[in-house]
Structure formats: C-alpha cells, structure tokens
Curated annotation (Swiss-Prot):
Residues 23-49, 83-95 have a biased composition (Polar residues). GO terms for cellular component: host cell cytoplasm; host cell nucleolus; host cell plasmodesma; host cytoskeleton. It is found in: Host cell junction, Host plasmodesma; Host nucleus; Host cytoplasm; Host nucleus, Host nucleolus. Its cofactor is Mg(2+). Residues 11-16, 37-52 are annotated as: Nucleolar localization signal. The keyword Cell membrane does not apply. It comes from Potato mop-top virus (isolate Potato/Sweden/Sw) (PMTV). ATP binds at G215, V216, P217, G218, S219, G220, K221, T222. This is Movement protein TGB1. Its EC number is 3.6.4.-. It holds the Pfam family Viral_helicase1. Residues 58-67, 96-107 have a biased composition (Basic and acidic residues).
C-alpha cells in the first residue's frame, strides 16, 4: 500500500507478509496386525454352523455411524471484510466481493496450478485481525496437487460468525442431545451434559472459511493431512473423527479425538482446524469444534461416499464446497474397483492386480489379516467358534493387506447402506474374501442391492 503524498509506505503498514516457515520432513508410521483365524477348541472341526434364528440377532452398533439429519440451511451471505486504514485515516476502498476466493497469479503453473483459487488478503500480517489465511491455503493447495488431488475450481465458503445459530442447527442439536441424555448418542450422560454446557457457553464467535478435500479409499487423504500438519508451520489442530485412529497418529503434533475437544473445559485457539474422517461427525459437532477452537479456517478430509444426507445431522447439510478431490485409489486394484463401480461408487483402482473371491458362509477358509462383520450379533456368533472379528464401522480409515468379510443372511439389510458397503469393500490392498451364500453374492456383485433408506430430513438424527 503506497501513500498518496510521496510514494513512501505508511509507517504502520507492513509491506511484506512474513516469510514462510521451512517445512519439516517427518514420516508417519503405520502397520497392521492380523487377527488369528483359529477356533479356541483344537478338537473342533473348521466346518461350523452359527446359531440360527433371527430372533437372537440384534442390529448391532452399525446404525450409530449413519450421520445424517436436518433441514437444508439457508443461503449464507458473506460478512463485510475488515478494511485496513491508511495513515491519513481514510479507509482503503473495499474490493468488490471481498469473500471471493480468487486465482493466485504468483502460484499459477508452479505449485497449485492455474485452476487453484485462494482468498485475497485483507491486509496485515499473520495473526493480525485482517489476515484471512492466504499463506495457509497457498500451502495446502500446493500439497494437494503434489499428492495427486485435482482442484475442482470451487472457492472456500465463508460462514458468518452467527451461522451455527442462524441456520437453526444449534437449536436442533441442543434439543436432540438433551432428549438423549439417558440413551447414549456416543456420549455418556455426563459427557452429554458437558457438551451441552459448551454449547451454551458465551464464547467469542468467529467467522470462518471452510472447504473439503475428498478422495476415494486409499487415495492418500491421511498422508496428505499428515504433511499439512507437519510441514505447514502454522497454528493448526488435527481432529480425528474416528477415535480408534488415535494410536496411528500418536506422533502427530496437536492431534486429538473429536470427543477430547468437545469435552474440553478450557479455552484454546488455532488458525486452522483439520478434521479427518469428517463423515463420522455430525454437523453440530463440526460447528461446535470450530466454536471451541475459534479457528478461522476449517478443512475437512474424508470420502463423501461414506457419508449420508438422510437426516439433518449429516455434515452434507453444511454444504461445505469440495475444493480438491481424487477418484483414484492407490490401495486396491482393478478387481475391487470393478466391484465398487457396480455398487454405484465412482472408484478407480491402481495398476496392481488384486482379487475378490466368494466362499460359503459356513465352512473354512485361509486366514487373513482381519475379519470384519456388519453386526454385533454376527461378531458374537464367530467368537463362539473361536474366530475374532471387528465391526465394519470400527475400521473406517484403516488399511490391511487381506480382509475377510462375513455376511450371514440376517445381515442382508446392512448391504443396502451405501456408507457401510463402501467401507467394507475398500479396506484391503490385495485380497477380499466375502463369506456369504451364493445367491447373496451374485446380487452383491451385480449391484442389485439398492439402498432402501428413506429420507428423514425433518429430524436432526436417528430416533
């Protein structure tokens, strides 16, 4: 900004932004452990038959992860940008549409590409009241392109400070949580009371920019998030939507589960909030996380195919724009990609060969790294035969070399849930064995199990 008198800069306005922080190279560690595919009685034969009767079966805990509910929020109008003032006391003329995310001419062709659009700066240095976060978004865009994600050309969306309340989500979230104090909702009664207290607290509200980085399973979302957090050099916090991933992120700085922040009894602040597996959270939880951290930028990482818009609690009703996406998986190969496409998922597999095989539900098969099931009742059946297994909802975001999926006829209804199908069919790198009866398998590979879920967008969450 130049003075209108002699070309010298006003003494109160800095000419340059602060220098970028040099990236720090770090490596994340990951590993898988296989569950023993053995019976606890060596005298028993491998050919077994689970107890029958649908009356003994429960639906399990799967439905708890189908986050979706609430009416579509009204259109969000951008706030007025803070205008930096000149040394003469006159306000600098405000640019038209200050909230727009524009193309960065300096970065075009070098890092983020010509289609990447980042916010214009409102003046001031990093940490000042006028700083909108150009450096952070510049760096995130650069890493996204380097990691194989493609820009959608959409800008980040600005949400006004009062959006949580004005959208109606705050009222519905409080009402829903209050009505379930004695029913769970992934929180104990004491935890629910703490969350309600945080919702009603008089915290300073902050407008924020939000965008989503989405990708199919195995596209590198987690690796990208690690790089952003470790090499960015800015004040950021990572939130894990899946708490079971905490051990895998133990070496990542400023990384917490969503519940740890939702129950936090002190005030914290960060510039950038990075949320992993955001489809496992509700819209109200995401907005409360932003409120607690007072963050200016919120970036969601996840797979939209693993979400749902069936109820208002779904993050989809926040209408966060997808700014980068990837449809190519480095995890599984062509056979799995073909199976997923028949299920309605727009997946592209890697170049390596993998396999999807079918085996009878009753009988024996080679051991794999992990056995997964849809319902708690099926897990208990297998455990009686000495076979350990894990719920599909608990392995979202995880990866294994080989996987066995058990599907008894009683669990057929779970296959109509697109979210659960997407997770179950995409955890392996080299081999997926599906244990079910032949008729069900043919319906599965032919994509004949269409979703039967009915919209309930008049409700915040499941009853």
């Amino acid at each position: 900004m130049e003075s209108g008198f002699n070309g010298s800069r006003p003494h109160r306005v800095k000419k340059d932004l602060p220098d970028r922080v040099n990236p720090v190279n770090t490596q994340g560690s990951s590993g898988t452990t296989g569950n023993a595919f053995r019976k606890n009685n060596n005298n028993k034969t491998q050919n077994w038959k689970p107890r029958s009767g649908p009356g003994n079966r429960n639906e399990g805990d799967q439905t708890k992860n189908n986050k979706s509910d609430l009416q579509q929020p009204s259109e969000v109008h951008p706030e007025n940008q803070v205008r930096p003032e000149s040394s003469t006391g006159e306000s600098v003329k405000q640019q038209s549409e200050p909230h727009r995310v524009l193309e960065d001419k300096k970065q075009s062709g070098k890092t983020a590409g010509s289609s990447v659009r980042i916010p214009e700066e409102g003046g001031g240095g990093l940490g000042s009241a006028n700083y909108l976060g150009k450096r952070q978004l510049d760096f995130v865009a650069k890493l996204c392109v380097e990691s194989g994600f493609k820009s959608t050309g959409k800008p980040l969306k600005r949400y006004p400070a009062e959006f949580f309340k004005s959208s109606g989500l705050l009222e519905k979230f409080v009402k829903y949580l209050s009505s379930r104090l004695d029913k769970g909702c992934n929180l104990s009664q004491r935890e629910s009371e703490v969350v309600l207290k945080n919702l009603r607290s008089k915290r300073a509200e902050q407008s924020f920019l939000a965008g989503a980085v989405t990708g199919v399973p195995g596209s590198g979302k987690t690796t990208l998030l690690r790089k952003v957090q470790c090499e960015g050099g800015f004040n950021s916090i990572v939130i894990l939507g899946n708490p079971r991933s905490k051990t895998e992120f133990s070496n990542l700085p400023s990384c917490y589960t969503a519940k740890e922040i939702l129950l936090l009894g002190i005030a914290i602040k960060c510039e950038v909030l990075l949320i992993d597996e955001y489809t496992l959270l509700t819209s109200g939880e995401i907005l409360l996380l932003q409120k607690i951290t007072n963050s200016r930028i919120v970036i969601l990482f996840g797979d939209r195919a693993q979400g749902s818009s069936n109820t208002l609690c779904s993050p989809e009703w926040l209408q966060v724009p997808v700014i980068f996406q990837s449809l190519t998986s480095r995890r599984f190969g062509k056979a799995t990609a073909n199976l997923c496409r028949r299920q309605g998922f727009d997946f592209e597999g890697g170049e390596h060969e993998d396999k999807v095989v079918e085996s009878p539900y009753e009988g024996s098969s080679p051991a794999t790294d992990i056995n997964i099931v849809f319902s708690e009742s099926t897990r208990e059946d297998l455990l009686e035969c000495g076979i350990e297994s894990t719920l599909v909802s608990d392995v979202q975001g995880k990866e294994y070399n080989t996987v066995t999926l058990f599907i008894p006829d009683e669990d057929r209804e779970y296959l109509t849930n697109a979210h659960l199908r997407s997770v179950a069919f995409s955890r392996h790198k080299f081999a997926l064995e599906i244990r079910c009866n032949p008729e069900l398998f043919m319906q599965l590979i032919n994509g004949e199990l269409a979703s039967k879920q009915q919209p309930q967008t008049d409700r915040y969450g499941p009853e």
